[in-house]
């Protein structure tokens, strides 16, 4: 019962992220945390990296998160020393 509630919550969360048009453009919130911007179907590897770089991140990569989710585009922050 608990796992089905988690599944429903994750599906709902994914739908909100995917249906929100503002979530498709990466935003540098504080420049320190990786940011998930969408699925790799929406952002193929080349477009994922390019979108992240254009949004002031160091780069982006399609990564697999968990068993129930497909590959998602994650932007990695720039670190300044």
Swiss-Prot record:
GO terms for biological process: defense response to fungus; killing of cells of another organism. Keywords: Antimicrobial, Disulfide bond, Fungicide, Plant defense, Secreted, Signal. Coiled coil: none annotated. It comes from Arabidopsis thaliana. Belongs to the DEFL family. Gene3D superfamilies: Knottin, scorpion toxin-like. Residues 1-26 form the signal peptide. It comes from the Eukaryota. GO terms for cellular component: extracellular region. The keyword Calcium does not apply. This is Defensin-like protein 32. Disulfide bonds join 40-62, 48-73, 52-75. It is found in: Secreted. The keyword Heme does not apply.
